[in-house]
Amino acid sequence: MQAKSKTESRAEYCTGYSEDVDVIREREYPFLKDTTYLDHAGTTLYPKSLIDSFARDLTSNLFGNPHSRSSSSQLSTQRIDDIRLRALRFFNADPDEFDLVFVANATAAIKLVVDVFRDSSPQGFWYGYFIDAHTSLVGAREIAERGHRCFLTSGEVERWIADLATDQKNFPRLFAYPGQSNLNGRRSPMQWCKKIRDGSSGAGNVYTLLDAASLVSTSPLDLSDASAAPDFTALSFYKIFGFPDLGALIVRKSAAGIIKKRKFFGGGTVDMVLAQGMPWHAKKSTIHECLEDGTLPFHNIIALDSALSTHGRLFGSMSNVSFHTRYLAKRLHNRLAAMTHFNGQKVCHLYMSPESDFDNSTQGPIIAFNIRNSSGAWIGKSEVERLANVKKIHIRSGSHCNSGGTATSLGWTGPELLRNFSAGLRCGDDHDVMDGRPTGILRVSLGAVSNLRDIDAFARFIDEFYIEKEPEFVSLVPPMEVVLQEPSFYVESLSVYPIKSCGAFKVPDGQRWEIKREGLAWDREWCLIHQGTGAALSMKKYPRMALIRPVIDLERGVLRITCGSDSKELEVSLRREITNLVTTSLCQSAKSSNVCGDRVVVQAYSSPTVASFFSNFLGVPCTLARFPPQISTRISNPTRSSRRSQRALMPGSFPEDPSPTSEQPPILLSNESPILLISRSSVNRLNENIKYNPRPSYSTPAKAVEADVFRANIVVAENLHQLANAERPYIEDTWESFSVGPEQLCFDVLGSCQRCQMVCVDPYTGTRREEPYSTLVKTRKINSKIVFGRHTSLSNMELSQGAGKPKSCTVMVGDVVTPQIA
């Protein structure tokens, strides 16, 4: 493709739209205020006027079940017929040549085709698919009894097509491919369908299935030439319009013969059926009538009418959307490709097919990439996505349900992926880098309503947080001579978190608090579980959990709980009670440690009063559960640095986390370790960094954060009058162990605490904000991990005395802390 001039390319920006895209956004997409949405390949967004139009339609008309004969039912049937025709015309599909079957989504359309082929022949069918296929296309191979093949390159497909003319196989064959990769936007040749049809004209048993879900989101699908069109086209309307949640299967009527062999039939698809005696039925005559099982989602179909009208009014045509998004995608791609660190190392590794050049036939508005630091090390995709989320930038990371494209882009082989799976890699987890290679890919995708500000915001985000503009020699610990001074630390505060992810109970001054091998007494002994899934709730997903505040009343033997400003109070006995046992997972998705994703047995409180107390406050069906005493405790696994050990510390260096011991300490419902420690001096230094962290002129000034956002059990502080007011932030990074109190209780340091965006939840308001995570990313990134605080546990030597006799261990606010430096 010849290069276009800058003026000519700029003319593509929102050309043909009813108004400037910024004006459309302000009026039609109020939820985009202060938000950068770059996940249009997941779903594009619905305009306000679409919802208003649909609401008017529903409130002005009475729509009945289309299978009835009443006037309301006939109205529904009439509207469905009209909208079916309108949808076909949207894709330039002649209703004499094509029929459209309404389904739930593109995956449902694919499954419907596969079901048809499964029943088409006693011999079964053969299935071929392209490497860029979505998981839903790959899954069809499991039903292909005559075998299957994954085509790795376009050349392989072309050679297979060339051989069809001499192929005498007489069983049905189906070739499926995506019109556009949902991973990187690579577009496959549309002419394959015609080539396959022409090449197999003698046999007439080779069919094509086009997954158009990603393609149609920003590009016109032209089916005007029925001879060149796919036999089956699967798509989702929400990818185009944002709403309704509805899909379609477009079928060439010349392929209707194989459809008639489908065995299953549902309500509304037959003219008559005998329920007893002879198993006989007569299917309806049209393609859509015999494939649309049961009552159609007629309200969603009616909403499609409003979607088509609104989209046309705002954007004119899909060609306009295509030009607009192509301009933006090329602009963003070029900016990311040009980014370099101070030493010339590229910041972004872009995964774009060599065959793609942002021509409409080869590339869609999707950019797939990963980020490297100045030394070439990969930045974890999860960290980037978490930080983007904090900055209100919506992107996606992972394999994107496109395992073939991801593996090919990253250079993973099948055996290597199986080894990764055995090592714990799962879809959606935080295993970002294994064997020195990324396990997933970052993706930004553009849509009709994307604008230049979206591009600029994302480019600024990468520039601010991931471009190293000069060599950094950040002193993470004080100079050597300061480290060697006689330390003078004390316990400033003790916090117990009885309910996982909820508020803290502050241990009163002057009260000694029992500490066990699994942590402070009563810490993380309870959790809230979803009554439907059994998964433990997390503040990451439900920030209002921070406002659930427990108080441990040892005198009365109860846990008193309040929620926000509500005066209602719930009391739960500290004594063990018999409750229903349920199995639950600590997180809904697997994490890099062995904590989140563990299946643990907890005792769920069966009282409706308990369940409603928490459910009403959080707005989610949940109840309280407790870690039972008879069940073995879990094993801690704190995040560890990958640095080699170095006993002799140089100024400005960061020490190796202690090597794992042969026996890891147990934990209850804590995420990674029995006890978490932070220092007041480190919090103060972080707040100084937050204050002086450069910010865009339009952003609000950042506020200092409280130590409570880090949810530490122990906060240590320094006696500054003994040190001439010389605070030593992050000196705890050098600690190998420490002792506390008059009895010199010994604690082992297990490693550094890796941080996520949970620290952005204000513990007093339950609201999310950017800090401190945004500043931590800049100042506390160690080996591509954002760390703050230290995981600790009571030393094994403190757990018994004499002949295995239990030893009582306690700590108190004000106790002296004596560290042992690594």
UniProtKB/Swiss-Prot annotation:
Its cofactor is pyridoxal 5'-phosphate. It catalyses: Mo-molybdopterin + L-cysteine + AH2 = thio-Mo-molybdopterin + L-alanine + A + H2O. One of its GO terms (biological process) is Mo-molybdopterin cofactor biosynthetic process. It is an enzyme of class 2 (transferase). Its EC number is 2.8.1.9. Residues 643-820 form the MOSC domain. The active site is at 401. Residues 633-666 are annotated as: Disordered. GO terms for molecular function: lyase activity; molybdenum cofactor sulfurtransferase activity; molybdenum ion binding; pyridoxal phosphate binding. Pathway: Cofactor biosynthesis; molybdopterin biosynthesis. The modification N6-(pyridoxal phosphate)lysine is found at residue 239. InterPro entries: Aminotrans_V_dom, MoCF_Sase_C, MoCo_sulfurase, MOCOS_middle, PyrdxlP-dep_Trfase, PyrdxlP-dep_Trfase_major, PyrdxlP-dep_Trfase_small. Keywords: Molybdenum cofactor biosynthesis, Pyridoxal phosphate, Transferase. Sulfurates the molybdenum cofactor. Sulfation of molybdenum is essential for xanthine dehydrogenase (XDH) and aldehyde oxidase (ADO) enzymes in which molybdenum cofactor is liganded by 1 oxygen and 1 sulfur atom in active form. HAMAP family: MOCOS (MF_03050). PANTHER family: MITOCHONDRIAL AMIDOXIME REDUCING COMPONENT 1 (PTHR14237:SF19), MOLYBDOPTERIN COFACTOR SULFURASE MOSC (PTHR14237). Belongs to the class-V pyridoxal-phosphate-dependent aminotransferase family. MOCOS subfamily. This is Molybdenum cofactor sulfurase. It comes from Aspergillus oryzae (strain ATCC 42149 / RIB 40) (Yellow koji mold). The gene is hxB.
